Amino acid sequence: MEQKIKFPRSQKVYLPGKLYPNIRVAMRKVEQVPSVSFEGEEKIATPNPEVYVYDTSGPFSDPSMSIDLKKGLPRLREEWIVGRGDVEQLPEITSEYGQMRRDDKSLDHLRFEHIALPYRAKKGEAITQMAYAKRGIITPEMEYVAIRENMNCEELGIETHITPEFVRKEIAEGHAVLPANINHPEAEPMIIGRNFLVKINTNIGNSATTSSIDEEVEKALWSCKWGGDTLMDLSTGENIHETREWIIRNCPVPVGTVPIYQALEKVNGVVEDLNWEIYRDTLIEQCEQGVDYFTIHAGIRRHNVHLADKRLCGIVSRGGSIMSKWCLVHDQESFLYEHFDDICDILAQYDVAVSLGDGLRPGSIHDANDEAQFAELDTMGELVLRAWEKNVQAFIEGPGHVPMHKIKENMERQIEKCHDAPFYTLGPLVTDIAPGYDHITSAIGAAQIGWLGTAMLCYVTPKEHLALPDKEDVRVGVITYKIAAHAADLAKGHPGAQVRDNALSKARYEFRWKDQFDLSLDPERAQGYFRAGHHIDGEYCTMCGPNFCAMRLSRDLKKNAKSDK
């Protein structure tokens, strides 16, 4: 089961740290062919620089490494984690459910075989990236993300505000999250915050009727190839525990989950039977496996549930509907809200971040920015402060379905009420009339809210509202959202964001077709369309033909102007 990811004319490169010289920050270098010009009859070739691009493919794109999915990825961060001296390796897993799955011999054929014993903070030790940052410590993870965000800006002479100290300060103040469970050492450090590159998340996961472990692992790798910055396993079908283990051990990006889904499976789908003890064991189980962040719908309050009654589409969040029903059936405050401090105590022992789930997000543009949505946001603002008190990194989930003229209010209100914690939104979709094209309706809103300050965008595929996405849907969703995120980075003026655009535009003007393909987000798709047009590698395409190509005519004008001089 060896896996490789390849990109045309690209080379995997590693930049060293300065504070920590032994760290190797992975990125991809794209080679370009020379520009060709003529001085009279003389042909002149002028070299074009290599272009460095952010790379989420991990060791899978390193030709010097052999990756076997049955053994998992190299444990990149384990030496850093253990070297700090504040964690201990447990003699065995401590989750009751995890132990039960481990001891069930009927699952041996499904099990990932090379499972390491989990780590946990030593008693009295604060081991989260936020705790280190508050103490003024720049960790290897912090320097790693600073280098990764800048790529080769220093070499290009591009000024940047993103230094290891800036990263530390943003994490200490809660303005950025570096999701890095100590039990997922395979993950390459990355950062989520509005003063950094806009990130995208990919949702995968099986359902009760569809998919297998192999398919979900394949989707995870596929997401990493095309640029997914984080991955959420939203499995609700069989063998959730084993599926998650396979994904985490082979995933070079942070992995998130919604623990309430598995907790509900443990009570056979009966919401009334959910309780704190089952949920607590689920948290520990997943912390010990290596989940980097949890979506937790603790913002649902007993007194807020009825606010959704006025809506056209009610409650559309799975986690939100589960907790709302639990509150109503028991006529009690949510156990997630009541035990939020206990939740944070657990997460802090493994450095798991909390993503405060928007259980009352609007599911139609009719319901956008309503009382229910903003009441939950107010509670999230309270919860984020409680998380920070426990040194738990936190970010805020947002909508949803929001027309363009209401997007700005979402961003401004989130910054104010949630103390500038990172915002993480699902789109938003700006219209409801395009089933089958909701990757487009949502990317329009995603680009806009990313520009306004959202730190991470949750992708939407063409099958949103229709079916479980397959591998091709994952590709389309990721590429669509990479476009939205990059458009936001350009609008925000992120250091070096325009380097790739300028290189591709120059290649287009000079009819360097191969460079256009190789610099694009999806080289295979671009080249496929070009070849399907029966082109030769000439100075025009079939869109305009030889006589109507504006760039060709523009180049001729330049040549004539040069000759006149």
Swiss-Prot record:
Belongs to the ThiC family. Keywords: 4Fe-4S, Iron, Iron-sulfur, Lyase, Metal-binding, S-adenosyl-L-methionine, Thiamine biosynthesis, Zinc. NCBIfam families: PRK09284.1, PRK13352.1, thiC. Its cofactor is [4Fe-4S] cluster. It holds the Pfam family ThiC_Rad_SAM. This is Phosphomethylpyrimidine synthase. It is an enzyme of class 4 (lyase). GO terms for cellular component: cytosol. It comes from Bacteroides thetaiotaomicron (strain ATCC 29148 / DSM 2079 / JCM 5827 / CCUG 10774 / NCTC 10582 / VPI-5482 / E50). InterPro entries: ThiC, ThiC-associated_dom, ThiC/Bza_core_dom, ThiC/BzaA/B. Catalyzes the synthesis of the hydroxymethylpyrimidine phosphate (HMP-P) moiety of thiamine from aminoimidazole ribotide (AIR) in a radical S-adenosyl-L-methionine (SAM)-dependent reaction. Binds 1 [4Fe-4S] cluster per subunit. The cluster is coordinated with 3 cysteines and an exchangeable S-adenosyl-L-methionine.
